[in-house]
Amino acid sequence: FTNIKTRAIIDLTVTGHWITVCRNGGNGFTGVVGGCNGDGITFNANLSETELRKLPYGGVWNAQMRLKTLEQWEWEKIGDVVTNIRLNVRSEPSISVPNSTVKLPVTITGHSEPVTVDTCLFDGTGAGDSSRYELRLDDLSGAARGNMFALKNVTKPDAHPLYYTVSAGTPGTNGDKTVWTPGLSKVFTGMDKVPIAGTMATGGKVVPCVQWPLTLKLQSFNPVRQAMGQYQGQINLVFTPSLNMP
């Protein structure tokens, strides 16, 4: 089987069953003897779940099965039965965040340097078959404001939050980053043309993925007026690829 996008090749074993018009039959595709007077043989082919699991990732995989038919006794070739097989394979989309817990450094002046969070997006095929990505960043603190995400005081939840922004560009590119608004979806088209430069583990396999780094920047604050303590926040990344398969 050949992936039409990546040209990767994987060998899978096709199993099957045959039966003649005389109702005799058997398993496999070799040694089929007994066309009898009706001269008709029906072949049923299938791929087991075990074989399908050998595919390294999703996408469209093509193969051609050719059965040679011979006339009994003389063993002269009658012809070939050619079957084109196409598998449209898709796994569940997934997101990899290798370092999902980050710290935003704070100085005594209330300023902070940006921190990058690396993420990688697996569209369910790993072959770039999704032309459209929809992405959304949700702030789970419940205290987001405008285009700012919030960090809440762990021991004093009613204290004034610290705020930070999240910036990101088009996945898979080095384009300019823009500040995202919590809970607001963005749609990116032409994603089947961007480089698939990353890898991630999902479902026991290593699959290709599209890199999408996020930049977190803590907003300036007055340390004198800010309640002391540890501040925490959480972002939920929602990724919805659309799959275009022929």
Region spans (language model):
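Signature of Gram-negative chaperone-usher
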Residues: F1-N46, S141-P223
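N-terminal small/polar-rich segments of proteins
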Residues: N44-G169, W212-Q234, V238-P246
